[in-house]
């Protein structure tokens, strides 16, 4: 039987797992860290999953009409996913994002036909959310899908990503590690894995300089895609066993090591997740345990950032 997708959205999900053998060897780990490589999604990130899920959910509930305008505050990857799905399904899209987001991300969504409105970097995602709400009041029939509150966000990870990880590992997983932006990824996957095996440990990752999940003040950081500066409604603390706070430089250094050692060109948040997984693997009590982490996106949209600014930001 021919395997031909009818539309691009049919290719979202079912991303591969990869053993980080060379990286793990350089860190002298007993067991290689395993990575779910989400840049194999057609839009280049894990956020393709929630973009498709939120739009489909809004269609099914009748709140998103044909040809309507979708508005979304986003730090980048969700915007790319929404732009891709909107192009396929015929929606107008306006994205609000902090001006600190990379130029590649802005231009990428524009290429799909989206309109971008930049907000003050010092206001973080809070400013982007505020501007999105203003636009919704101005544009009749528009819809904000609101990834930070939408239950379809964690639910799609429960239904797809978590199930994929369990099946790909044949149930042999002890610890799952993921960064927290909206919290939907770690919450949905964590809930599914704990249903399969309550002993699976779920670890969330956030920037050390904006460690709100650990009760510390929000602040600026360099790890794009995680650390929104507030605790999202889509974050389910009940499935989280531990939250690790990761420094900017450790995330950046690890991201560079993944490219140099594994040929994995990923984003800064992938570096944070793998560094957190490394810290866990180095604990004596975790010796020999299988640790799976998730690499949210491709590094191609970070080439203008500190991640690959080797001369200007040496480590």
Indicate where each model-derived feature is located.
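PLP-dependent amino-acid enzyme catalytic core
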Residues: 1-315
């Amino acid at each position: 039987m021919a395997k031909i997708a009818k539309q691009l959205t049919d290719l979202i999900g079912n991303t591969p797992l990869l053993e980080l053998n060379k990286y793990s060897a350089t860190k002298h780990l007993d067991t290689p860290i395993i990575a779910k490589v989400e840049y194999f999604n057609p839009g280049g990130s894990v956020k393709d999953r929630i973009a498709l899920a939120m739009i489909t959910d809004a269609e099914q509930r009748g709140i998103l009409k044909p040809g309507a305008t979708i508005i979304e505050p986003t730090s980048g990857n969700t915007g790319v996913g929404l732009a891709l799905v909107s192009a396929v399904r015929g929606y107008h899209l306006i994205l609000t994002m902090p001006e600190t987001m990379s130029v590649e991300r802005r231009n990428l969504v524009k290429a799909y036909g989206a309109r971008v409105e930049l907000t003050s970097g010092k206001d973080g995602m809070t400013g982007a959310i505020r501007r999105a709400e203003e636009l919704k009041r101005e544009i009749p029939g528009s819809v904000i899908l609101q990834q930070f509150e939408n239950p379809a966000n964690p639910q799609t990870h429960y239904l797809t990503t978590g199930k994929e990880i369990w099946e790909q590992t044949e149930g042999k997983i002890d610890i799952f590690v993921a960064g927290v932006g909206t919290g939907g990824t770690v919450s949905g996957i964590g809930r599914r894995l704990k249903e399969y095996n309550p002993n699976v440990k779920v670890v969330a990752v956030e920037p050390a300089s904006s460690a709100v999940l650990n009760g510390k003040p929000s602040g600026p950081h360099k790890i794009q895609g995680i650390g929104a500066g507030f605790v999202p409604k889509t974050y389910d603390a009940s499935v989280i066993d531990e939250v690790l706070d990761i420094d900017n430089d450790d995330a950046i250094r690890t991201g560079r090591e993944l490219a140099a050692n594994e040929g994995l060109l990923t984003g800064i948040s992938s570096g944070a997740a793998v560094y957190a997984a490394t810290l866990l693997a180095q604990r004596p009590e975790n010796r020999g345990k299988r640790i799976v982490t998730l690499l949210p996106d491709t590094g191609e949209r970070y080439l203008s950032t500190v991640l690959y600014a080797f001369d200007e930001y040496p480590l």
